[in-house]
Amino acid sequence: MITRDFFLFLSKSGFLNKMARNWGSRVAAGKIIGGNDFNSSIPTIRQLNSQGLSVTVDHLGEFVNSAEVARERTEECIQTIATIADQELNSHVSLKMTSLGLDIDMDLVYENMTKILQTAEKHKIMVTIDMEDEVRCQKTLDIFKDFRKKYEHVSTVLQAYLYRTEKDIDDLDSLNPFLRLVKGAYKESEKVAFPEKSDVDENYKKIIRKQLLNGHYTAIATHDDKMIDFTKQLAKEHGIANDKFEFQMLYGMRSQTQLSLVKEGYNMRVYLPYGEDWYGYFMRRLAERPSNIAFAFKGMTKK
C-alpha cells in the first residue's frame, strides 16, 4: 500500500525535483498547474471563471534564502495582483511567507507584505497567507494578525491536523478573519499533530463548525465528500447563507464535483498553482489522499 509518508519522502527528493523541473512542466501545465508563469495561466483562469468557478493563484516555490529573491517574488506578486485587476479576473492570490523571506529576516517579510497588501487594498484583491509546516505556524499567524488589523483584503489558513488549531480559531475570532480550513499536508510529529486520520477528520468538522458559527467567512478546502456534506448540513441546520462560505479544491482534481457545487448554488474556488517548482506541491497533495494517485496521473497524461 502506498502511504502518506512515502509521498512526503518523495516531495523532498532534490533529484526528482530537478528532473520534474527539466521535463515535467510540459506534462503538468494545464493538468495540475496553470503554466510556467502567471501570464501563461490567464487562459485557464478565464476558462474556469466562464464556468462559474472562482480562482486563487499561487506561484509555487518556497524557502527563499536570499533577500534579493524575496524582493523579486514580492514584485512578481504585486504585478500579478495588478494584472488580475486589469484583466478583470475573478481570482485571489495565495502566497507563503517563506517566499517573502520568513527564514531570513522578519523585517524583510513585513516590508514585502506591506507592499503587496497596499496593492491588494487598492484593487480589492484578497491575499491569502498560506500555512506551512508547524515550526513556522506561530510566526505566520503573528504576521496575519498584525496585517489583519490594518488591511481588509488578507486571509490565512489553519490546518485541522494540528492540536493547536481550535485555540488558534478562538484567538483570531476578534479579527473577523476570513480563514481557509484544510486538513494539512506536511509531515509532523505526533507531539504537535493528530497521527490518526479519524482524529483529523473530527477536528476538521469541529473547526468548520466553530468558524462558521462564529459568523466569519470560511473557505472549506477539501475533496472529501463527507466534509462537503457535513458543511452543507451544518449550513442548512443553522441558516447559514451560501454567501458566507465557499468550497475550495485543487485544479485538476474532482473537476465535475466543482461544477456540480456551482450548479447547486455554492461558491466554489479553484486553487491554481503555477511555476516550475510544481513537483513538491504535487507530492504533498498526493500525500493528503494517496488514493488519488491513479486519478491524478490519469489527469496529467490524458489529452
UniProtKB/Swiss-Prot annotation:
Inducers of expression: The expression of the putBCP operon is induced in a PutR-dependent fashion by very low concentrations of L-proline in the growth medium. CodY represses the operon by displacing PutR from DNA.
Residue positions binding FAD: M131, Q159, K183, G184, A185, T222, H223
GO molecular function: FAD binding; proline dehydrogenase activity
GO terms classed as biological process: proline catabolic process; proline catabolic process to glutamate
Keywords: FAD, Flavoprotein, Nucleotide-binding, Oxidoreductase, Proline metabolism
Record-annotated site: Critical for catalytic activity: Y271
Listed name of the protein: Proline dehydrogenase 2
Organism field: Bacillus subtilis (strain 168)
Origin organism lineage: Bacteria, Bacillati, Bacillota, Bacilli, Bacillales
